[in-house]
Amino acid sequence: MTDAPIGIFDSGVGGLTVARAIRDQLPNESILYVGDTTHSPYGPKPIADVRRYSLEVLDLLVEQGVKLLVIACNTASSAVLRDARERYAVPVVEVIQPAVRRAVAATRTGRVGVIGTVGTIASRAYEDAFAAAPDLRLFPRACPRFVEFVETGVTSGDEVLRVAAEYLQPLRDADVDTLVLGCTHYPFLEGAISYVMGEGVSLVSSDIETAKDVYRILVSGGFERHDSAPPTVRYEATGLDAEHFLRLAHRFIGPEVSQVDLVQTGVIDLSL
């Protein structure tokens, strides 16, 4: 069990931010990453579909023998976390609570913005997560085109800045001092988001805090990897275009992603 990989899943390349943070903090751990590019993006899809897609990918990871699951997707975290923790015998880590924890520590004024996909914002998952900090005022905002930009490799330029300004102006008007990047794709747009929000606004993402949660669970459970052999890091995608995923991975996290394998998930009937 200790030598088994950590399983990480996202709808596409956004979860690579989380995978990179886990590799930085736990360099001896093996990783198996799956991007569900067949169904990406998750954000605009009905929650029932997101739930089914997510469980199909998580089933695939468990079948491949992972020792811990990371749902590196805010939309999936909001849709399937409870199901996943009931369904699987391995620990399940999500990305919403880690971001909330960091935002609560970062804010000075108690005015916190959160941006995410339509699905994440509509789920009110962040409102629920921030409920334990009643002195904070939360300003949620859906930014649906941000995932589209990242998944097509566009992270800068006039159109990105124009769309970012349109999405973020209400948060500037609300005078937030902390902005939660409530989608793991959004750190790839951090330059544009930071430029639009201006100095004095702290941007909070879940990647580093999620990696801390993974570290804590592995150490406290006594199943961190001690093998002296180099760890393995594998990347899989459910879509038909592994080369596209590979190009984006090279651009965003570097040439260490040398291969992407295509995989197929099973089909789950959640009506049973």
From Swiss-Prot:
Reactions mediated catalytically: L-glutamate = D-glutamate
EC supergroup of this enzyme: isomerase
Residues holding substrate: 10-11, 42-43, 74-75, 184-185
GO biological process: one example: cell wall organization
PANTHER family: GLUTAMATE RACEMASE
Functional summary from the UniProt entry: Provides the (R)-glutamate required for cell wall biosynthesis.
UniProt keyword annotation of Ligase present: no
Organism of origin: Leifsonia xyli subsp. xyli (strain CTCB07)
Protein name: Glutamate racemase
InterPro entries for this protein: Asp/Glu/hydantoin_racemase (IPR015942), Asp/Glu_race (IPR001920), Asp/Glu_racemase_AS_1 (IPR018187), Asp/Glu_racemase_AS_2 (IPR033134), Glu_race (IPR004391)
